[in-house]
C-alpha cells in the first residue's frame, strides 16, 4: 500500500510529517509513503504579518487542495494552522502525540516577561501574542517578526530583537532539548496558546473511510481528546487570527481541563472549564470567552 502525502516543504513541516507517518507505520508496517511538497500563500508572502494577508488558511489551503484534487491521499498540517471549518469533502482524521503546546519568551538573556527591560523590542506577528504581551508589559515595544523558526531565532541571536514570543513545540521539534537560545515557558494562565498548537494533524477525503479508520488507529488518544475540545472551542468562539484569543485543553484521566483567554485594549481575561465531555468543555470555554469579547462582562 502506498500513500501520497502532501505537506509544506519547510524543515519543521518535514519533521512533523515524519512524526505522524511514523505513527501510521507503527500500526500498518507494510505501508509506503510518497511525499508531495506544496507551496502555500503563507510560505510565499513573508513581508506582512499573518493577519494582514487577508486569506483564510494561508498555511493549509493549497495543501488540502492537493487532496481534494486527488493529487495526494493525505495532507499533513500543524493543527493550529487549520481553520475551524474545512473545505467540503475533507475531514480531520489523525493526530500525532502532542509536543508541549505552550508559548515561550525566547531570548539570549533568558528573559521572562517580568524581567524584560523597559522599552525592549519583542518580536511576534501574532495578534494574540502581541495583545497579551501589551496587557502584561505595556512598557515594551512589540513589532512584527515573520519567518520560519530558524529565521526568527537568528534575528534574536543577531540582536535585532531583545526577545520573541514563539511556540515551544516548533523549537523542540527542530532542536530537541538543546536549542541555541533560551526559553522561558509561558503558562496558559499567562498567555494561552492557539488551539491545536503542538499537534500534527492529517486531513483526508471524507469518502476514504478505510483511510479514516487507519488514521484513527494511529492517532494518539490524549491528543485526540484535546484536539476535539480545542476544535470545538475554535468553532464556537467564532474568531479568526485578527482577534487575540487562545485556548488549550488538558486531558487527564477521565476529565478535560480547558484554559482560555482573550486580550484587548491593554487588558486580558482568563477562564478555566473542567468536564468529562471534550466537546461540551470546548463549547463552554468559548461561551465564557465570548462574554468578554462581546462586552458582556
Curated annotation (Swiss-Prot):
Its EC number is 2.5.1.61. It catalyses: 4 porphobilinogen + H2O = hydroxymethylbilane + 4 NH4(+). The keyword Zinc does not apply. Gene3D superfamilies: Periplasmic binding protein-like II, Porphobilinogen deaminase, C-terminal domain. The modification S-(dipyrrolylmethanemethyl)cysteine is found at residue 241. Its cofactor is dipyrromethane. GO terms for cellular component: cytoplasm. GO terms for biological process: protoporphyrinogen IX biosynthetic process. Binds 1 dipyrromethane group covalently. Pathway: Porphyrin-containing compound metabolism; protoporphyrin-IX biosynthesis; coproporphyrinogen-III from 5-aminolevulinate: step 2/4. Keywords: Porphyrin biosynthesis, Transferase. One of its GO terms (molecular function) is hydroxymethylbilane synthase activity. It is an enzyme of class 2 (transferase). Pfam families: Porphobil_deam, Porphobil_deamC. Tetrapolymerization of the monopyrrole PBG into the hydroxymethylbilane pre-uroporphyrinogen in several discrete steps. Belongs to the HMBS family. The porphobilinogen subunits are added to the dipyrromethane group. This is Probable porphobilinogen deaminase. The lineage of its organism: Archaea, Thermoproteota, Thermoprotei, Thermoproteales, Thermoproteaceae.
Amino acid at each position: 500500500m502506498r500513500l501520497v502525502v502532501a505537506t509544506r516543504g519547510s524543515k519543521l513541516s518535514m519533521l512533523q510529517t515524519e512524526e505522524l507517518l511514523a505513527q501510521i507505520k507503527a500500526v500498518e508496517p507494510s505501508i509506503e509513503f510518497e511525499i508531495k511538497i506544496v507551496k502555500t500563500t503563507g510560505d510565499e508572502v513573508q513581508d506582512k504579518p499573518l493577519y494582514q494577508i487577508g486569506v483564510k488558511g494561508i498555511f493549509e489551503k493549497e495543501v488540502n487542495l492537493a487532496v481534494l484534487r486527488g493529487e495526494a491521499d493525505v495532507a499533513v498540517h500543524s493543527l493550529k494552522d487549520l481553520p475551524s471549518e474545512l473545505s467540503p469533502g475533507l475531514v480531520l482524521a489523525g493526530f500525532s502525540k502532542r509536543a508541549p503546546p505552550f508559548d515561550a519568551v525566547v531570548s539570549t538573556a533568558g528573559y521572562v516577561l517580568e524581567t524584560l527591560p523597559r522599552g525592549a523590542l519583542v518580536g511576534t506577528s501574532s495578534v494574540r501574542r502581541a495583545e497579551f504581551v501589551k496587557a502584561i508589559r505595556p512598557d515594551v515595544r512589540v513589532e512584527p517578526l515573520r519567518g520560519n523558526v530558524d529565521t526568527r531565532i537568528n534575528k534574536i541571536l543577531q540582536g535585532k530583537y531583545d526577545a520573541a514570543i514563539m511556540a515551544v513545540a516548533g523549537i523542540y521539534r527542530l532542536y530537541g532539548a538543546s536549542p541555541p537560545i533560551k526559553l522561558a515557558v509561558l503558562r496558559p494562565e499567562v498567555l494561552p496558546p492557539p488551539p491545536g498548537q503542538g499537534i500534527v494533524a492529517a486531513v483526508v477525503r471524507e469518502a476514504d473511510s478505510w483511510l479514516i479508520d487507519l488514521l484513527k488507529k494511529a492517532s494518539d488518544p490524549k491528543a485526540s481528546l484535546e484536539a476535539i475540545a480545542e476544535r470545538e472551542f475554535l468553532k464556537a468562539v467564532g474568531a479568526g487570527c485578527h482577534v487575540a484569543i487562545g485556548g488549550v485543553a488538558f486531558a487527564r484521566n477521565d476529565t478535560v481541563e480547558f484554559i482560555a483567554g482573550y486580550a484587548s485594549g491593554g487588558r486580558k481575561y482568563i477562564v478555566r472549564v473542567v468536564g468529562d465531555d471534550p466537546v461540551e468543555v470546548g463549547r463552554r470555554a468559548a461561551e465564557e470567552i465570548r462574554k468578554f469579547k462581546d462586552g458582556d462582562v
